[in-house]
Amino acid sequence: YDILLVADEVICGFGRTGNMWGAQSFDVQPDMLTCAKALSSAYLPISAVMMAEHVYAPLRAQAEQLGIFGHGYTYSAHPVCAAVALRAQQLIQERDIIGHVRHLAPVFADRIGRLQAFDFIGHTRSIGLIGAVEFAADKITKCKFDPTVKIASQAVAIIQNHGVILRALPGDIIGFCPPLIITELELNDMFDRVEKAFVEVSELAAQHR
């Protein structure tokens, strides 16, 4: 359709899905790509925009007429942030972080999938080391809980009491996004704690059906 495709890789980039870029995991080739956060492992703020040659070429052509590349921000190209980002990327390669994610992905998928055994979980999904569980008042119809109950937010609070910090997302969803350096032992411990917390969440869910 002659429309540029931009991939937002701020969360999914740098190995999160088991490939360097999330787009690769879904066999998608974007025209432009945005990234941040894991670019420097979040030690210092930095972001970047990457683009294919067919997008860059007209920008370059116009810049040559102006005598300067017409793009920039007041705080761009900070040398310390750039140095930290460079070292972070070196460590990702040296420690084979992507290989580690691929090794743990089946364990992650299995453990998050087991959570569907709880009668208030309507759906689970994951790729690499990112996943989510979706709450449902009825597992068959996938009917949602009353949004005023904020079941996911309440569940997150209960889970936190068991030592795991997760995030409630719109639509009664809880996201899982563990550190890419997590060990298999730590991963299983995390899900063991979530399962214990979900026993308490079961009582909460029963009250609001």
Task: Give names to the regions the model predicted.
Residues 1-209:
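Conserved N-terminal phosphate-binding loop of PLP-dependent enzymes in the Aspartate aminotransferase
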